[in-house]
Design a protein with these regions (language model features):
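N-terminal nucleophile
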Residues: 1-145
Length: 145
């Protein structure tokens, strides 16, 4: 994967940029999804993740349920697989929110919550090559003016 997606935020704005998109984009409030393609590419895992994220955000948002969402290893049904040119078996492997594979897979997942008061909760969970959970780092801080 030679492309990248990058998010930058302060207390007021969230920006997304990719080396595959024509220009940076300031994101309006809402639920977005990103994988190894452009923002909101309608791959099954992006659509599924956005739906679950929206549901989590309607309740009392917390970091742990977000990390659990990102840890989902269920794969898409055959008819929901995209055709990115890697073949059906690989498409199936890559259709999980958390890809488990020794050669190529999810090595960390990050959840960030920003409250209206500027309080930020940041957590990152690391995984080994066999998919085992390694550790979780947690930080809390406030955006300053």
């Amino acid at each position: 994967y030679s492309g990248f997606n990058f998010l930058a935020a302060d207390h007021d704005e969230l920006w997304w940029v990719s080396n595959r998109a024509p220009a940076p984009q300031c994101l309006a409030p809402g639920v977005y999804g990103v994988s190894n393609h452009l923002l909101d590419t309608p791959w099954s895992k992006v659509v599924r993740g956005k739906r679950r994220l929206g549901s989590l955000l309607r309740s009392a948002p917390a970091v742990e349920p977000l990390l659990e969402l990102l840890a989902d290893t269920s794969v898409a049904d055959e008819d929901e697989l995209p055709d990115t040119g890697v073949g059906p078996e690989r498409e199936r492997l890559l259709s999980a929110l958390r890809v488990v594979s020794p050669a190529y897979g999810t090595r960390c997942s990050t959840a960030v919550l920003v409250g209206g008061d500027g309080r930020v909760q940041f957590a990152e969970r690391a995984y080994g090559a066999q998919g085992e959970e390694r550790d979780t780092l947690r930080y809390e801080f406030r955006f300053s003016d």
